[in-house]
Swiss-Prot record:
It catalyses: N-terminal N-formyl-L-methionyl-[peptide] + H2O = N-terminal L-methionyl-[peptide] + formate. Keywords: Hydrolase, Iron, Metal-binding, Protein biosynthesis. Belongs to the polypeptide deformylase family. The keyword Mitochondrion does not apply. The active site is at E155. This is Peptide deformylase. It is an enzyme of class 3 (hydrolase). It comes from Lactobacillus helveticus (strain DPC 4571).
Length: 184
């Protein structure tokens, strides 16, 4: 079971490196890693389990965040009522197209690897098309918009050595392009 002590924190070099692609079939180690990352997200969104194990709630977790420099990320995205609207483990994901129009979360973003609050809007594409493989090696291409697209972009950034605050406008953290969609 992944706990907060297992989450790599900002400053660790693995978070700033481009993760390596995985080859198929995945080894048992990487299959277990995918399971463990998803289990963390499920547990972190359950108030009783999260409190018992002192887990910070998360909607996404990338392999570099647990010290594994490989192209894998787990996503468990709820809607505003707590119902899961997107659940997947990406292996070797690639954003193949993105909208010109941007979106951001009204409250900004956070990250399990970043302990401090960093205020500001994090502009990301409003819509994404992502090509990836499942843990079983099935090739998929999906189109996402709004919150699932933002979470996917955040996690894929981790696989490319970027953190959310890299996208915040340093001079004007709450400045946005005119047609940016702000998601509450």
């Amino acid at each position: 079971m992944i706990l907060m002590k297992d989450i790599v924190r900002d400053g660790d070099p693995v978070l700033r490196q481009v993760a390596k692609p995985l080859t198929f079939p995945l080894s048992d180690h990487y299959k277990q890693l995918a399971e463990d990352m998803m289990e963390y997200l499920v547990n972190s969104q359950d108030p009783k389990i999260a409190e018992k194990h002192q887990l910070r709630a998360g909607v996404g977790l990338a392999a570099p965040q647990v010290g594994e420099g490989v192209q894998m990320a787990a996503l468990l995205v709820p809607d505003d009522k707590g119902e899961i609207i997107f659940k997947e483990v990406y292996v070797n994901p690639e954003i193949v197209s993105e909208s010109v129009r941007q979106a951001c979360l009204s409250e900004g973003e956070g990250c399990l690897s970043v302990d401090k609050v960093i205020n500001g809007y994090v502009p990301r594409p409003d819509k994404l098309t992502i090509h990836y493989y499942t843990v079983d090696g099935e090739e998929k291409t999906i189109r996402l918009k709004d919150y699932p697209a933002i979470v996917s972009s955040h996690e894929i950034d981790h696989l490319n050595g970027h953190l959310f605050y890299d996208r915040i406008n340093k001079k004007e953290p709450f400045a946005l392009k005119e047609d940016t969609v702000v998601i509450s």
